[in-house]
Swiss-Prot record:
Its EC number is 2.3.1.181. It comes from the Bacteria. This is Octanoyltransferase. It is found in: Cytoplasm. It comes from Paracidovorax citrulli (strain AAC00-1) (Acidovorax citrulli). Belongs to the LipB family.
Length: 231
């Protein structure tokens, strides 16, 4: 997999470039990983609801065709876009998601942090009371949503989200990807229901005591994705 470190790039232009790359690629087009960061933007996925944008203020909102709901991108966040031909790679979408999440978990482990999955809520989470604990996270049952009694939501008690995942698959090829919070202004997350979950805490490496550079975190995540997404 080719890795391209793009630095700070325009979000809308990057989304358009991913779409164009995917539309034009052939069976011989090499897979590529774009790693970048963006100026402050909220992005809405296909499952997004306007009421999850509580008070966007002066931060632009961009509608996208990725899966998932609303999230925030900004400086100090590593955004990785794997452009992978799944048919050639030999695995399906569910396995692809697992591999991307595993790359984020291994990246956190590099910095001494234990990342966790939560059933029914894509992305990676950390324990707020002890981010370095290796104890397994019990998979708790979903709890009732008082606003939607017929629905149920994952139990995020004691957890904070540190990496968000949102993908699109077209003609067996992936785009969009994963965002890892490194050292960023987290205030904009209070203006939304992150990924559609009211009150879900969002953290970055800095707030849980890990001080590193964007470049180092980007390098580790890129390396892990290249390893995990290999055929």
């Amino acid at each position: 997999m080719q890795v391209r470190m793009l630095g700070r790039v325009d979000l809308r232009e990057t989304v358009e470039a991913m779409q164009a790359f995917t539309a034009q690629r052939t069976g011989d087009t090499p897979d590529v990983l774009w790693v970048c960061e963006h100026a402050p933007h909220f992005t809405q996925g296909l499952a997004g609801h306007a009421d999850h944008l509580l008070a966007p203020g002066d931060i632009p909102v961009v509608a996208t065709n990725r899966g998932g709901q609303v999230t925030f991108h900004g400086p100090g966040q590593v955004v990785a876009y794997p452009l992978v031909d799944l048919r050639r790679a030999g695995y399906y979408v569910k396995e692809y998601v697992h591999r991307v999440e595993e790359a984020a978990i291994r990246t956190l482990a590099h910095f001494g942090v234990t990342g966790h999955r939560v059933a029914g809520a894509p992305g990676i989470y950390v324990r707020l009371d002890d981010p370095r604990s290796h104890a397994l996270l019990p998979q708790r049952p979903r709890k009732a949503d008082p606003l939607e009694p017929a629905a149920a939501v994952p139990d995020f008690t004691g957890l904070g989200k540190i990496a968000a995942l949102g993908i699109k698959v077209s003609r067996h090829c992936t785009y969009h990807g994963v965002a890892l919070n490194v050292d960023m202004d987290l205030e904009p997350f209070s203006r939304i229901n992150p990924c559609g979950y009211a009150g879900l805490p969002t953290v970055d490496l800095s707030t849980i005591g890990v001080h590193t550079t964007w470049d180092e975190a980007a390098s580790v995540l890129a390396s892990q994705l290249a390893i995990r997404l290999a055929p």
